[in-house]
């Protein structure tokens, strides 16, 4: 028995899967379909998506395409990078961080159009179904969610193609379309499937679509300077940039120098292990730069606490809990830590490497050469270290005198 749905907002990419879903919703739910397409920097011409939706019978007023690049970077990517968030030590969360923004607009458009449900094209095996739906329920507990991949029997590409042909859905292949399952936005490109399902099979050289092969990158390194204010990058080489402009420029620089390639096996929230390859050129530069400016502006205790909390914060984003109270609590703590993260970082980019070569903060540095110098100084009494060491060694001394062995 299908849910009683009169109108549904579909997260629509214009591809085979979501085009089939569009017709399937009409056929199986007998409902009106509204489409929503987010421009989050996937570098794709979105005009054909609107034309395809019209061709499939969607009313002009029911087609929504929004440029969310600035909001995506400003309100999602930058807060995440203020935390130095990395999942399982390597993954920069490029797919994970985009899902809550899409959920937000699915819910907003549903309210605007008086729709009673939303729908997405995520499969029943992956993390995205969780991310989309947790976000939607957090923002509207009364929303209905339709996930066709968990309902229908179109469980193979052959069946999808047959359904598309039967319903007059254009299935012409895009020129140069990747055979891999891909996700792209302004932060990254991900690749899954095919030969990558064997974790011991090296990716094909032509799989990588964004970054230069590090071996073929320029033989001359390039030095850049990023300026930070309250933990956010605001200027590149002296030029002030908006958040999405900053990430775009860093992407171009990183891609040119072969920076940001990653091949990992990760633990999905739904329980299985999955192999994925990622290109995150600008994000890789930002992470290195942000940690560098933090190194001279954040107090030791605050920095260590932040590093202890980061894996939990990253896991919350990976698992789809962006709109949770615990993520908001952690964000407040993280943002408080960024109050004095102001200054400039110099980096050298060379054949896949991001090398920090300088950092300064004229207003907020905690680095004081008078205390740390190896030369003679007049501010630090080295004799003080003796008592400090004895107090920290006291438990070892007591245990040793009591016959305890390590």
From Swiss-Prot:
GO terms for biological process: argininosuccinate metabolic process; L-arginine biosynthetic process; urea cycle. Keywords: Amino-acid biosynthesis, Arginine biosynthesis, ATP-binding, Cytoplasm, Ligase, Nucleotide-binding. L-aspartate binds at residues 123, 127-128. It is found in: Cytoplasm. ATP binds at residues 11-19, 38, 121. GO terms for molecular function: argininosuccinate synthase activity; ATP binding. Pathway: Amino-acid biosynthesis; L-arginine biosynthesis; L-arginine from L-ornithine and carbamoyl phosphate: step 2/3. L-citrulline binds at residues 91, 96, 127, 131, 181, 190, 266, 278. It catalyses: L-citrulline + L-aspartate + ATP = 2-(N(omega)-L-arginino)succinate + AMP + diphosphate + H(+). Its EC number is 6.3.4.5. Gene3D superfamilies: Argininosuccinate synthetase, chain A, domain 2, HUPs, Single helix bin. It comes from the Bacteria. GO terms for cellular component: cytoplasm. The keyword Ligase applies. InterPro entries: Arginosuc_syn_C, Arginosuc_syn_N, Arginosuc_synth, Arginosuc_synth_CS, Arginosuc_synth_type_1_subfam, AS_cat/multimer_dom_body, Rossmann-like_a/b/a_fold. Belongs to the argininosuccinate synthase family. Type 1 subfamily. PANTHER family: ARGININOSUCCINATE SYNTHASE. Homotetramer. This is Argininosuccinate synthase. It comes from Campylobacter hominis (strain ATCC BAA-381 / DSM 21671 / CCUG 45161 / LMG 19568 / NCTC 13146 / CH001A). The gene is argG.
